[in-house]
Each structure stands twice: as structure tokens, then as C-alpha cells.
């Protein structure tokens, strides 16, 4: 992942391909729909070929499950916005603010991470809570970014 910063000098954040523990593809970077809902590239699609991806490619955002960025950029944009606490859309907002600084958001197909999706919130909250929290934060996110996304 570190190599991406050398190859792509304007890189603001880089993330790996994410897989569920069983090995199924969770996402290869993310796009954003005009309504703020994510497009998780390749999600659960057995025909999606990670090997066919470029080594580094631009995406709208990468998941905070595994995200690398420069400390100076993190401090300059003020880190994660606490308005999204405790979870959901904080990583998406962070990447949007980096993009607003002219930084690129990159996926590297050369790194993979196994991720138990929603494990943090499901350990203390219900699936219904996670859905409500995600939707609440999507609306906050759209309040900040709707003009850019549409």
C-alpha cells in the first residue's frame, strides 16, 4: 500500500481489496451513488476478477476497515469528523475531504485484508441499530456532499 504514495504522488489515501473471512470478495474499492449509497465494487461477485484490476486505480473512497494515509494530510483535514460517531460514513467523508484537497483515493489490488463487516457494532448493538445508524449518517453525509455527488 505504501508504494502507491510513490507511484501516485497526489494519493491521499489507499486501501486494499477487502474479503470476508471465508475469502469471498467484500469490495475492491467503492464508488458513490448520487444519493450517497455506496457502490462496493465486485461485492460477492464470483465472476469479478481482482487479477484483472490495475495495480493501482482511482476510486471514490476506500473503507476505513483498512486505510492508509499520510499523517500530515490526516491532521490537515482534522481527522475523522466526530459527527459520524460511533460508526458509518466517517471513512467516506474523510475521503471526500481528501478529494476536496485535490488528493486521489486509490485501491491497490496487490494488498488484501480480511474484514468481518459490522463486527464492531454487532458486538454491542443490534443489526437494526446498525441500519438506523448508517441511514442517519448517510443523511448527514448528503447534507455535506449532495451538491458534489449530484
Q: Can you annotate each of these PLM segments?
A:
Residues 1-2, 52-54, 58-78, 83-112:
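A short, conserved alpha-helix in the catalytic core of glycosyltransferases
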Residues 32-33, 50-53, 78, 119-128:
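Short glycine/proline- and charge-enriched loop/turn segments
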Amino acid at each position: 500500500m505504501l508504494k502507491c504514495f510513490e507511484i501516485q504522488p497526489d494519493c491521499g489515501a489507499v486501501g486494499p481489496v477487502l474479503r470476508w473471512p471465508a475469502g469471498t470478495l467484500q469490495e475492491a474499492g467503492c464508488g458513490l451513488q448520487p444519493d450517497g449509497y455506496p457502490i462496493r465494487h465486485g461485492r460477492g461477485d464470483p465472476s469479478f476478477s481482482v487479477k484483472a484490476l490495475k495495480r493501482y486505480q482511482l476510486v471514490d473512497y476506500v473503507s476505513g476497515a483498512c486505510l492508509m494515509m499520510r499523517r500530515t494530510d490526516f491532521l490537515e483535514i482534522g481527522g475523522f469528523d466526530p459527527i459520524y460517531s460511533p460508526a458509518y460514513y466517517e471513512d467516506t467523508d474523510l475521503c471526500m475531504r481528501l478529494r476536496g484537497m485535490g488528493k486521489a483515493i486509490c485501491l491497490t489490488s496487490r494488498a488484501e485484508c480480511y474484514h468481518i463487516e459490522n463486527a464492531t457494532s454487532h458486538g454491542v448493538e443490534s443489526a437494526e441499530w446498525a441500519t438506523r445508524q448508517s441511514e442517519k449518517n448517510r443523511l448527514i453525509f448528503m447534507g455535506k456532499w449532495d451538491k458534489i455527488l449530484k
